Amino acid sequence: MKVRASVKKMCRNCKIVKREGVVRVLCSDPKHKQRQG
């Protein structure tokens, strides 16, 4: 899980999801998981 100021899709499988006010990127590739912080 990477914590970044700006989260971006890194591939076409990435999905941007907002959970409890936190923007996250979910993907089939675990290296692409991100959270806005």
From Swiss-Prot:
GO terms for biological process: translation. Pfam families: Ribosomal_L36. It comes from the Bacteria. GO terms for molecular function: structural constituent of ribosome. InterPro entries: Ribosomal_bL36, Ribosomal_bL36_sp. Keywords: Ribonucleoprotein, Ribosomal protein. GO terms for cellular component: cytoplasm; ribonucleoprotein complex; ribosome. Belongs to the bacterial ribosomal protein bL36 family. This is Large ribosomal subunit protein bL36. It comes from Haemophilus influenzae (strain ATCC 51907 / DSM 11121 / KW20 / Rd). The lineage of its organism: Bacteria, Pseudomonadati, Pseudomonadota, Gammaproteobacteria, Pasteurellales.
